[in-house]
């Protein structure tokens, strides 16, 4: 009888551990989905010159002016007060290093208008914006998935065609399960 009770306690303990592990995994997935949803209205702008000032307020003001000029000058988007929910630099400030800038919009439409008009950067002749690039703000798991997809495509390219990958660009297009890698030849 004592052995049977001990067995029942172990089964209950194992069942409790399994339930706890499942609940932790569900919470992790829910948190990831919420994080992805929160990032949907954000863009990351790279190589924006950073004002060389010790004053945080001066640097923030400079960044806000640059973003407003960029959106107006390149994308013809008139940003009003309150259209940008958040805007800050990513990483630690160091002298002479331009950190990426995260910009979060109040409305998804602003971000979508920017991302669908990225071709305007190539036609842009304003020197102030040369070298600047914009990308989606992605969850770390998404970034890793995209990186792995590109690496796999490069390996497959080398195996099938034997041609060096240096002459090609590999780009991931699509969303979610509909993502695929396309390759195109670099221009000389």
Where are these regions (language model features)?
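C-terminal folded interaction/catalytic domains of modular proteins
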Residues: 2-188
